[in-house]
Structures are given as C-alpha cells and as structure tokens.
C-alpha cells in the first residue's frame, strides 16, 4: 500500500494538469536523499574488526577504546576511492617548524630526517626521556604530506618529540648512489633507529608507518626480532602482499586514478637522478614505465639486486613474516582499500601472534579514514595514534613481551 501511495503521488506530480515540474523534482530529490541517508545509517557506520592474540587484544580494548568503537565515515564520501582522493584534496596542512638533519648511509647514500619538537613539554619535563614518534611516509611522500603533518601535529600536542624519516630523494635531495628505496630493504630504517637511540638512549620510541612506510616498519620488525629498539609499532594502510597490491592497482579504474599518477611521480624521481642511476641500468627504458609493476621490473628489482620483479615482491610482502615479529604492532587497514585488498590481510597469523594486531574498518580507503561532516582537520588516523601512543608510552608494562630491547642490547 505504501508503494502504491508513493507511485500515485509521483504520477500526480508529473502530470501536466498539476502545474510545473518543480514539485516533482523536489519530491524525487527528497526521496533520493532519504534513501541515501537510510543506506548510510543502515550499512556504513560499523565497529572495526580487531584481530589479535588474547593479551594484546585485552590491552587494546582497555587502553585504546577507538579500536572497539563504531567508526562513522564522512557522510558524503564514504566509498574507498573517494576517501582516498578527498583526503588529498580537502585536508588542511598544519604549519610544522621542522629542523632537518642529513644522515649519511654506509653505502654512500644520504637522506633527510625532519625533527619537530616543542621547546618544553609539560607532559614530560625531562627531554632525555621524552617519548619519540618516528613517522615513515608513503612511497613517494615526505614530511610535507598533509597526513604526515597532521600526525606530527598530533604527536606534538600529546607532548612527544616527532621525527619524519624521508626516503632517499623524496625531499628533493640528490641521490648519491643508484639506489633510492624499496619495501624489502630496511637498512636505512636501521640507520635511523640506531641514530635516534644513540642520541636519546632513555627515550621510548614508537615507529608509525603509513602505506609504504608501514611495509618498512613490518619488515624491519620481522628482520630485527626483539632487537629492534622500539617499544611498539603502528602501521596505517600498509600493503601486506605486493602481488595483491599491483593486481588491484592494475584494474581499469584504479589504474587511472592511482597507478598511473603514482608511477609518473616515481619516474620523475628516477629521471631527476639519471646521473647516478644510469651507471647500472637503462634510465630511458625505466622511465617509460606506465605501472608500478613495470617500474619495479625495470628499476627497483635491478637496483636492489633481485632476479626479477616477482622475487622482489616475494621479499617485500610482510604477509608471510608475521611469525617473525616480536614487538607489539597495531595495523590499521580498511576493507575497501584499493591498494591493500582485504583478502591480503593475514587474519589467521595475527590471531595466533602475541605481537601483531589487525584493526580493520569496513570503510576508509587508502590513507583516508575521513570522519565527520567537515573532515578538514583531524581524522580517525589521528585518534588511533593519540590513543595507541598514550597506551604504549604510559602502560608499556601491559604490552606483550614487556617492551623491546635496543639494537645494542640485542647484540649482547
């Protein structure tokens, strides 16, 4: 009966005898909005799925309520690709006064660390023990990315010292060797952690990796075991399986929106450093790549000594290394992430691991996680960092393994 009533109203409104079409358009618009809102409230807001071993699960439920609370994605852009795109287009850029430091690497390369700190923190008046948040941006990102600026801003507000590890060449500096960076090679990250721990040996250190940076954090933890020098790790939108990632990015729409623009940016980095790279490979051939897979085949796998792209992807995928991780790490992923498909997440391995927890939201895209009607400022990622950092810095005794050793301790 309700359906017949609505049909009669529409027919009556659309009838020429009843005057203009404006009433019909208004009715259709109202009906469309009602259906949209009904769908949103019925299907979109959901509690995230938290997968972890018993001790880590209890720790997170007690100290990080965001892990069990309903996530409300932005009403007008909750689809994964829209979340990914609008995060880039809409988010503000906090002004962060960085202090840059150049680090030299054992192989003759260089990269930049960008430090951010408050002159005095009421949370931690002793600067030698002030907690440090180490941030690792995405594949072509730097300390200037809006999502990094917001996370740094959050860390500073919470009273921590923040430092951003910029991969080689990502802040415009020249490559001194043919190698830029790759997801399987954690040598530069090891250099960073040792440098920080040497300077601030008494300060607890939390590594936060976003996207590509998250892969580095996971591979670093798997490689170093209990000697990683971190109290904990946090990853956001990390890609767990490189094969699944490139397959997803090569679907038509994802290729147009993400794969091609990202590849073009990476090719510019290679072309800009032709002088150093052309000694070991054909730069002209490499920069003709139109996909991430092609560039990895022509440049990354060659520069880092892999037989081919498949060998590199096998080495770079953290999915198979969960058992080797011995430092607590919380991993935030969205089920609709176009870069990291949900089927790539190591659910069973995380459930058995004492140290790895997966926090999976139904929506959020890739480095999106926008929430609220006006998502210009902080988002879900900031809330996760705020609560998790506070938990690991203030309640580390409750973490699995009771914290981590320093790199120096691991050698003894």
Swiss-Prot record:
Signal peptide: none annotated. It comes from the Eukaryota. One of its GO terms (cellular component) is membrane. Keywords: Glycoprotein, Hydrolase, Membrane, Serine esterase, Signal-anchor, Transmembrane, Transmembrane helix. GO terms for molecular function: acetylesterase activity; monoacylglycerol lipase activity. GO terms for biological process: medium-chain fatty acid biosynthetic process; medium-chain fatty acid catabolic process. Residues 131-372 form the AB hydrolase-1 domain. The chain crosses the membrane at residues 24-44. Its main location: membrane. It is found in: Membrane. Gene3D superfamilies: alpha/beta hydrolase. The keyword Transmembrane helix applies. Glycans are attached at residue 18. Its EC number is 3.1.1.-. The active site is at residues 211, 337, 366. It is an enzyme of class 3 (hydrolase). Pfam families: Abhydrolase_1. It is a single-pass type II membrane protein. Belongs to the AB hydrolase superfamily. AB hydrolase 4 family. This is Protein ABHD1. It comes from Rattus norvegicus (Rat). The gene is Abhd1.
């Amino acid at each position: 009966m309700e359906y017949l009533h609505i049909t009669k109203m529409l027919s009556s409104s659309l009838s020429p005898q009843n005057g203009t079409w404006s009433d019909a358009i208004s009715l259709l618009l109202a009906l469309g909005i009602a259906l949209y809102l009904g769908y949103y409230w019925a299907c979109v807001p959901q509690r995230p799925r938290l997968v972890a071993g018993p001790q880590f699960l209890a720790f997170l439920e007690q100290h990080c309520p965001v892990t069990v609370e309903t996530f409300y994605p932005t009403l007008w852009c909750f689809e994964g690709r829209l979340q990914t795109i609008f995060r880039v287009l809409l988010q503000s850029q906090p002004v962060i006064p960085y202090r840059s430091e150049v680090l030299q690497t054992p192989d003759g390369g260089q990269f930049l660390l960008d430090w951010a700190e408050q002159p005095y923190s009421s949370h931690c008046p002793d600067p030698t023990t002030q907690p440090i948040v180490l941030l690792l941006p995405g594949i072509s990102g730097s300390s200037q990315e809006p999502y990094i600026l917001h996370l740094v801003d959050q860390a500073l507000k919470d009273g921590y010292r923040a430092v951003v590890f910029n991969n080689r060449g990502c802040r415009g500096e020249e490559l001194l060797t043919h190698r830029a960076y790759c997801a399987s090679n954690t040598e530069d990250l090891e250099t960073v952690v040792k440098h920080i721990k040497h300077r601030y040996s008494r300060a607890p250190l939390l590594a936060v990796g976003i996207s590509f940076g998250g892969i580095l954090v996971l591979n670093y933890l798997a490689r170093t075991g209990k000697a990683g020098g971190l109290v904990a790790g946090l990853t956001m939108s990390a890609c767990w399986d490189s094969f699944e990632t490139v397959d997803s990015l090569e679907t038509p729409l994802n290729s147009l929106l993400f794969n091609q623009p990202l590849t073009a940016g990476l090719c510019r980095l290679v072309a800009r450093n032709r002088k150093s790279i052309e000694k070991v490979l054909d730069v002209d051939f490499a920069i003709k790549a139109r996909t991430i897979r092609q560039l990895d085949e022509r440049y990354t796998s060659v520069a880092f000594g892999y037989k081919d792209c498949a060998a590199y992807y096998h080495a770079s995928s953290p999915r198979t290394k969960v058992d080797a991780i011995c430092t607590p790490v919380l991993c935030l992923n969205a089920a609709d992430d176009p870069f990291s498909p949900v089927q790539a997440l190591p659910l069973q391995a995380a459930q058995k691991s004492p140290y790895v927890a997966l926090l999976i939201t139904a929506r959020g895209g890739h480095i999106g996680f926008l929430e609220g009607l006006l998502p210009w400022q902080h988002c879900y990622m900031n809330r996760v960092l705020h609560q998790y950092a506070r938990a690991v810095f203030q309640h580390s005794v409750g973490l699995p393994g009771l914290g981590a050793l320093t790199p120096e301790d691991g050698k003894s």
